[in-house]
Amino acid sequence: MGLRAGGALRRAGAGPGAPEGQGPGGAQGGSIHSGCIATVHNVPIAVLIRPLPSVLDPAKVQSLVDTILADPDSVPPIDVLWIKGAQGGDYYYSFGGCHRYAAYQQLQRETIPAKLVRSTLSDLRMYLGASTPDLQ
């Protein structure tokens, strides 16, 4: 069973419709999942559910730490699947962005910039298969 997130998420940076800048590989707008989402939220790291173990390159994590300290706006936000449980609970799943996640953890930040991708239990099942929890 996943953790249930409480409290409101805080928005970061510019509002909806603001220019996004370049995403991975120089593409405008970020990832395939969140390319059309302009709003970036400061999501509490404590509410993120990361069910898959990460394989990290320590040098890449350190490079991101250095970049976050020097120019945090140049680091793209992570994508977070936002799923409503059967009884209205909010669940925030993160599968990618493992190096960015580790960098923010190393910096002992309480939040991480993220784009919330509204998703469903069916979407989550695509990632987790039979291991998908019964979200309340």
UniProtKB/Swiss-Prot annotation:
Its cofactor is Mg(2+). The modification Omega-N-methylarginine is found at R11. GO terms for molecular function: ATP binding; oxidoreductase activity, acting on a sulfur group of donors; sulfiredoxin activity. Residues 1-13 have a biased composition (Low complexity). It comes from Mus musculus (Mouse). Its main location: cytoplasm. Contributes to oxidative stress resistance by reducing cysteine-sulfinic acid formed under exposure to oxidants in the peroxiredoxins PRDX1, PRDX2, PRDX3 and PRDX4. Does not act on PRDX5 or PRDX6. May catalyze the reduction in a multi-step process by acting both as a specific phosphotransferase and a thioltransferase. It is found in: Cytoplasm. Residues 1-30 are annotated as: Disordered. It is an enzyme of class 1 (oxidoreductase). Keywords: Antioxidant, ATP-binding, Cytoplasm, Disulfide bond, Magnesium, Methylation, Nucleotide-binding, Oxidoreductase, Phosphoprotein. GO terms for biological process: response to oxidative stress. InterPro entries: ParB/Sulfiredoxin_dom, ParB/Sulfiredoxin_sf, Sulfiredoxin. Belongs to the sulfiredoxin family. One of its GO terms (cellular component) is cytosol. Residues 14-29 have a biased composition (Gly residues). ATP binds at G97, C98, H99, R100. This is Sulfiredoxin-1. It catalyses: S-hydroxy-S-oxy-L-cysteinyl-[peroxiredoxin] + [protein]-dithiol + ATP = S-hydroxy-L-cysteinyl-[peroxiredoxin] + [protein]-disulfide + ADP + phosphate. Its EC number is 1.8.98.2.
